[in-house]
Amino acid sequence: KVVIGVSGGLDSTLAFLSLCYMCDKYNIDRSNIIAITLPSGNNSSTTYNNAIDLMKKMNVTYSEINIKEAITRQLQEIGHDCQTKDVTYENVQARYRTFTLMNTANLKGAIVIGTSDMSEVALGWSTFNGDQMAMYGINAGLPKTVIKATTAYFKNIFPEVSDLIDSVIDTPISPELSG
């Protein structure tokens, strides 16, 4: 079993579709993919809807865990005003998502599949103990240009979600941590 956070963005979409492809290729039931979207209130409706629609249409085990209250509580506990959109505000979200994915993996006897790509790691666009941490980083060796091209290629493999793949590719790249 695998656990993956699906945001509706480019990196998580490629990682998610790769897992679906792997299941199909090796005759593994897609219910072994535990896909979770973790909105925080800073997500666009486009990425949120892309995530939900992808998970539904690909027939995986999926859920939504809204982390808005949890991150607000964490920010308050450390004395943050919850209004300043600084690095602390952003990183609490990434860390809480990873915390939730890791705990779900423990509960389900699964591993967490990371979605960070090589460009993000090389440029430092990741959160320590957040999105840079996983049990297997499926995108880790791929620069963003390859991520985009490979995601587009999956339209041929999964025509039932080609419209969603187009929407993901056309959406401006953003971590969506500040609203």
Locate the predicted segments by residue:
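General beta-strand structural signal in soluble alpha/beta enzymes
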Residues: I4, E64, I113-T115
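Alpha-helix capping and helix-loop boundary segments enriched in small/acidic/polar residues
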Residues: V6-L10, L38-T46, Y62, T88-V92, ...
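Amphipathic alpha-helical segments in well-structured domains
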Residues: F16, Y48-A51, T98, K144
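Generic long, charged, amphipathic alpha-helical segments
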Residues: L19, Y26, S31, A35, ...
